[in-house]
Amino acid sequence: MPPTSIYSHRFGSLVRAYQMVGFTPDRDYRYLETNKFLRRFYPEIVNQTESHIASLGGIVRRDPATDILRINDEFSISLVLARCQAPNSGRHHWKVRFDTSLTPDITVAVRLDQTNQAALDYFLLPNLDFGQSGINLAERNSVEFESYRFNNLNYLYGMAERIRLRRAA
């Protein structure tokens, strides 16, 4: 039997090859497709965030080793993707893992939708309030978490935007 790399090269993935022949494996391999998507999506969201802040006049420096963004030499952000997990109970939850070794000022947790194919919402989590290694989010969270939730990144962009001040008379 050929190695899985042959199937991946020919069909895109072993799961896709299974689907083409109508085979349903005993194990759920959807997480492999999700991981593949996340590897493509993460650089896109970092680039979009970096570009948008720069378009507003903000100065963005990205650490190439960690992807930590330093904004206007004032604060740093780390973007993390939180995949949707649905156990047998049917209740969706998300695990947000903080990169405690890098200690960014703000962790931007991008919570993915139920298909793990698009951003659902964003949590702007300051290190001062969330210094632990991670948190668990549900579909509905306590006000302590919900107060950090946003439908888009406009609040972050507002923090990074540079505004010219008129000269005083």
Q: What is each PLM-predicted segment?
A:
Residues M1-A169:
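Functional cation/ligand-contacting sites centered on basic and imidazole/sulfhydryl donors
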